[in-house]
Amino acid sequence: MRTVVWQSLSEAQQESILERPAITEGANITAAVAQVIAKVRSEGDAALFELTEKFDRVKPASLRVSREEMDAAAARLSETMKQALEQAYNNISKFHKAQKAQPIKVETMPGVVCEQVTRPINKVGLYIPGGSAPLPSTVLMLGVPAQIAGCRKVVLCSPPPIADEILYVAKLCNIDEVYNLGGGQAIAAMAYGTETVTKVDKIFGPGNAYVTEAKRQVSNDFRGAAIDMPAGPSEVLVIADETADANFIAADLLSQAEHGPDSQVVLVTPSPVLADQVTDAVQKQLKVLSRASIAEKALASSLIIIAESLTQAVSISNYYGPEHLIVQTRNPRELVPLLDNAGSIFLGDWSPESVGDYASGTNHVLPTYGYTRTYSSLGLADFSKRMTVQELTADGLQLLAPTVVTMAEAEGLDAHKRAVTIRVEKLQKAQ
């Protein structure tokens, strides 16, 4: 990790060191994904079987995972694993249930009533990546809010063979439409539908460059599907003072660095002594990590920033807008009102990022790459939509009519004006 003193940098240099590396998917990926999407749209299930065999080197007997297969997966899991997943499920459920929107009903003026009601998105698709280790935590983070929101159809796709842990959590979340599908072909199938796979309205979940590009392409097509949020590399920023535990900070930085070589890891502290201690602790802990080579690549482009004060550290963090923000200071709670841009915040010595990744109850699907300025952590609202309702009495319309008529005339919209005046005239004749 490179250490810099913030005050010694020019404004241009400060902006430069906080600039994230460009995400370049490349023309090859864009074209390849477009071909996959076109093939799935034209050939349906046949394309899904062909592409699954080509990319995943698996030839599933069926695209859809049966209820019997899901029950068998549950039976194979250890009780310890089941209990851990159930505890995480309960915590995540509790936090997301608290997010339920309450109906709003306001009389804005006599006889004019406005309401806001919330409805679930009808059909949603969840993408769960494959890889060397299963990701049941991602199923929890997507499946629980979909379940609580009341989405009528929830479709889950994951590359075969699907891990028992993933199938067990799908069962916990009452997801019974699970498919042996990965990559861009899974996104295309959910976005457009096939003979077997249900077309959904919105797609959630992380993935590799091909999945990310497929989500981008289908979200730009009005015939496709909406998506959760833009994707980017994982990142963490730690604000710490001289009271922080250097070993804790090193562990938190490394837990993010092991995600991938493009992960962003930043420590901001007013204490040069702590900065040196963290540098030493990172090197010691790195030696015992199974993914040390990956973490080392991420650390090579990571930073320790020496700030003048915690106030300046907060300013740096707000400018950067990290996905994960850890605050290890003497009074971390006092900084919360000053923090504007972060996906999820972890306060104090006993709140490692890992708890949010798995089981504290918050959602680990977070905006990254600076999108925290405008996007929020995933929650119940993302699986819902708002509708407004207005109802006017005859007296209410007559009271509001002059305002609407004046504004419609100013905008040159005569039909808008007439939709009001024709009613007012009828009321006046009846008097």
Curated annotation (Swiss-Prot):
Pfam families referenced in this protein's UniProt entry, alphabetically: Histidinol_dh
Biological or metabolic pathway of the protein: Amino-acid biosynthesis; L-histidine biosynthesis; L-histidine from 5-phospho-alpha-D-ribose 1-diphosphate: step 9/9
Binding-site residues, Zn(2+): 256, 259, 357, 416
InterPro entries linked to this entry: Ald_DH/histidinol_DH, Histidinol_DH_CS, Histidinol_DH_monofunct, Hstdl_DH
Function: Catalyzes the sequential NAD-dependent oxidations of L-histidinol to L-histidinaldehyde and then to L-histidine.
Any one Gene Ontology molecular-function term assigned to this protein's record: NAD binding
Reactions this protein catalyses: L-histidinol + 2 NAD(+) + H2O = L-histidine + 2 NADH + 3 H(+)
Cofactor: Zn(2+)
Active site: 323-324
Family listed: Belongs to the histidinol dehydrogenase family.
Residues annotated to bind NAD(+): 127, 185, 208
Recorded GO CC terms: cytoplasm; cytosol
Record lineage: Bacteria, Pseudomonadati, Pseudomonadota, Gammaproteobacteria, Vibrionales
HAMAP family cross-referenced by the UniProt entry: HisD
Record-linked SUPFAM superfamilies: ALDH-like (SSF53720)
Cofactor note: Binds 1 zinc ion per subunit.
Swiss-Prot/TrEMBL GO biological process terms: L-histidine biosynthetic process
Positions annotated to bind substrate: 234, 256, 259, 324, 357, 411, 416
Protein name: Histidinol dehydrogenase
Enzyme Commission number: 1.1.1.23
Record key words, sorted: Amino-acid biosynthesis, Histidine biosynthesis, Metal-binding, NAD, Oxidoreductase, Zinc
